[in-house]
Amino acid sequence: RGWTYKQILLHYYNNPGISLVKDSNLPSKVTYNGKSYSLAEYLGKTAYAEVGPSAPLESIKSQMVAIYTYAKRQNFKMTTSNHAFRESYAGTSSSIENAIKATLGEYLAYYGSPAFTPYFSTAAGKTASSANVWGGSQSSYPYLAGGRTSPEGNVKRTLTISSEELRKKVEAYNAKVDSSKRITLQSNPAQWIKILEHDSARGSSCGYISSMRIGNQTMRGNAFRLNIMGAATLRSHCFTFTYTPD
């Protein structure tokens, strides 16, 4: 669209209380998974893993600001569960290094405090709200209300999993939760999953799932993705499914 990185940021993190601020006290180190990195190293390795060096420069710049903001909110102490990270990246991309220099220390503030800036490389046509993704009250993050158009190319993937494989994933989930959250599957696998509500991000038949039933339990689509399927297996909670009997 020819947007600047500032326009990109204020499009996705959209609220009158959001502003772009320059940090006057940069950290000397950032900790990721127990290891210390210089700020530039951390930004580069994270951006390389998330958007890569071939993305438009303004997009990479906006990514840098989101990364820095996210880390600042975490007091620059991150774990492997926080985000993607490419350890092998060694400062060899001119676009990534230029984006670091152009935005170093810039972050998004919400009425003066670092905003919560989860980031992603692609969306299914528009963004999902924080309430859809994590639950809770939308008032906690009013600048993550969803519905923001996201014009990058969409990636469609097909995942095939047997009923036995899904049963094992449910059993693994049940072993980690208390009895009130354990899933009981019906005898017929065709009845195991039902999508109850989604935001129609891709049309009336597909969107980010805010409510679904698996067995006897109801949960958010992102909870199903993260806690049962695994984030690396099911890459998004914007999905449809079909069941084919053996």
Task: List the predicted regions and their residue ranges.
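Conserved, single-site charged/polar hotspot
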Residues: 1-246
